[in-house]
Amino acid sequence: MICLLQRVTHGSVSVSNETIGQISSGLVVLCGFQPHDTTESLEKMAHKLLHYRVFSDEDDKMNLNLQQAFSGKGGDLLLVPQFTLAADTKKGLRPSFHTSASPDLAHNLFNEFVALITLKFGPPQTGKFGANMQVSLINDGPVTFWLET
């Protein structure tokens, strides 16, 4: 599994000009899936995502995770499925998607990942799997990390 994590002051996702998910300060996470992903890799990513220290403490050091930074203040999480994250870009000028999970598998994995996050953190805002989405965000920092399991 691949996650592109972005610390934001605002994030939203729309389909057909209708906002389907929106957050204030927190994380926008683009999620890509590969054929070898399993429940175990999703659990590892959920743990990593929720405990990754990307928010500043009182000394302005990135030392706080999502729950610590917003304890009781409503830190938000927006998960967006993104098929293209797992593309093979090593050869040529056109990406190949043989390294991406099939649409059916990726859809199931995304739903399972959302369920894991809901269990461990609470319900996230989400994009719509398979839809043409417009994602807007205000990156804070910018702080962006590529996470893999």
Swiss-Prot record:
A single MF term (Gene Ontology): Gly-tRNA(Ala) deacylase activity
Subcellular location(s) of the protein: Cytoplasm
A Pfam match: Tyr_Deacylase
Main localization category: cytoplasm
GO cellular component, one term: cytoplasm
EC number per UniProt: 3.1.1.96
Motif window: Gly-cisPro motif, important for rejection of L-amino acids: 141-142
SUPFAM superfamilies: DTD-like (SSF69500)
UniProt KW RNA-binding keyword: yes
Catalytic activity line of the entry: glycyl-tRNA(Ala) + H2O = tRNA(Ala) + glycine + H(+); a D-aminoacyl-tRNA + H2O = a tRNA + a D-alpha-amino acid + H(+)
GO BP: D-amino acid catabolic process
InterPro entries (alphabetical): Daa-tRNA_deacyls_DTD, DTD-like_sf
UniProt keyword annotation of tRNA-binding present: yes
Keywords from the named record: Cytoplasm, Hydrolase, RNA-binding, tRNA-binding
Family the entry assigns: Belongs to the DTD family.
Role this protein plays: An aminoacyl-tRNA editing enzyme that deacylates mischarged D-aminoacyl-tRNAs. Also deacylates mischarged glycyl-tRNA(Ala), protecting cells against glycine mischarging by AlaRS. Acts via tRNA-based rather than protein-based catalysis; rejects L-amino acids rather than detecting D-amino acids in the active site. By recycling D-aminoacyl-tRNA to D-amino acids and free tRNA molecules, this enzyme counteracts the toxicity associated with the formation of D-aminoacyl-tRNA entities in vivo and helps enforce protein L-homochirality.
Quaternary context: Homodimer.
Domain notes: A Gly-cisPro motif from one monomer fits into the active site of the other monomer to allow specific chiral rejection of L-amino acids.
Name of this chain's protein: D-aminoacyl-tRNA deacylase
Organism field: Hydrogenovibrio crunogenus (strain DSM 25203 / XCL-2) (Thiomicrospira crunogena)
Gene from which the chain derives: dtd
